[in-house]
Design a protein with these regions (language model features):
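NAD(P)+-binding Rossmann beta1-loop-alpha1 motif at the extreme N-terminus of oxidoreductases
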Residues: 2-69, 94, 131-133
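Hydrophobic beta-strand scaffold residues
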Residues: 32, 53, 122-123, 269
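Rossmann-like NAD(P)-binding element
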Residues: 37, 51-110, 134-143
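Helical "substrate-binding/catalytic lid" subdomain
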Residues: 141, 151, 164-167, 174-303
């Protein structure tokens, strides 16, 4: 679907997500003005049809026709807070700001209230799709006033997998980022379940199980088929052993926020919480606890401990 080229949006933050989102919008005919403080990020988009990159924030603001629409794709916390403060001082009443980063929903509620006091509209947008979004479209969960979301609708329709599906006005300010937080918590649980299942398959070599073949087989007709499994089958077909990857899994803020939210609300979330703890353990955070456990067993039961310089059996 093509959109009115007179429609314009500013994309601020051109990393892996923001850069591809700018490309997708430009390819649908929406005029895009793009800026990032990093010159390499700007250079990567230079010359893209329908996309104008600028060198400074001042040029970025000046290039946008009023009332402006500015979409931020920045790390949560201080980078987003600082940028919103700067923009609030330079934009004019009636402009619309969209935070598409993985911000905490309470930060988004605070931003919405502060910007409204300056006459600015605000939408929080949880964005899912990763590096595949340019090709497949993005799943968008948005929060904010209905008038602001309606104004943003052509952009949401262009970014989504299809104009009618893949984006949702979830509720009031903060609702979009709350939905994205829970989405990422669910993602943690799903990924952990797949990882544990494939580890079990790998642990029984005497049965002749082929993890790559099973991953591909499970994609068709089974109750555990999913896009995550599609990706897993693809990389296992190339490298089923994965011995060049250290067994260390990073965790992002959303998994922690989801677990904390479950505690605050008294909502049982054992799978999400256990998946988060598994990531902590992979980062070496359980090493001291494991050593202490081994030493306790030796103290009360005389059980043997393994020397630190000896590899595990």
């Amino acid at each position: 679907m093509r959109y009115d080229p007179a429609m314009q949006i500013g994309m601020l933050g051109l990393g892996r997500m923001g850069g591809n989102m700018a490309r997708r919008l430009a390819r649908t005919g929406i005029g895009v003005v793009a800026w990032d403080r990093a010159s390499e990020a700007r250079a990567a988009l230079a010359g893209e049809p329908g996309l104008q990159t600028v060198e400074t924030l001042e040029e970025f603001i000046a290039a946008l026709t009023t009332p402006r629409v500015v979409w931020l794709m920045l790390p949560a916390g201080a980078p987003t807070d600082t940028t919103l403060d700067i923009l609030a001082a330079r934009l004019t009443a009636g402009d619309l700001l969209v935070d598409g980063g993985n911000a905490h929903y309470q930060d988004s509620q605070r931003h919405a209230a502060a910007l409204a006091a300056s006459g600015l509209q605000f939408v929080d947008a949880g964005v899912s799709g990763g590096v595949w979004g340019l090709q497949n479209g993005y799943g968008l969960m948005v929060g904010g006033e209905a008038t602001a979301v309606a104004r943003l609708e052509p952009v949401l329709r262009a970014l989504a997998p299809s104009p009618e599906r893949g984006w949702l006005h979830c509720g009031r300010a903060g609702a979009g980022h709350y939905a994205k937080m829970v989405h990422n918590g669910i993602e943690y649980g799903l990924m952990q379940a797949y990882a544990e299942g494939f580890a079990l398959l790998q642990a029984r070599p005497e049965l002749g199980l082929d993890v790559a073949q099973l991953a591909e087989h499970w994609r068709h007709g089974t109750v555990i088929r999913s896009w995550l499994l599609d990706l897993t089958a693809e990389f296992l077909a190339q490298d089923p052993v994965l011995d060049d990857i250290a067994p260390i899994v990073a965790d992002s803020g959303e998994g922690r926020w989801t677990a904390k939210e479950a505690i605050d609300l008294g909502v049982p979330a054992p799978v999400i919480s256990a998946a988060l703890m598994a990531r902590f353990a992979s980062q070496g955070r359980a090493d001291y606890a494991a050593r202490l456990l081994a030493r306790m067993r030796r103290s009360f039961g005389g059980h043997a401990t393994t020397p630190a310089d000896k590899p595990p059996p």
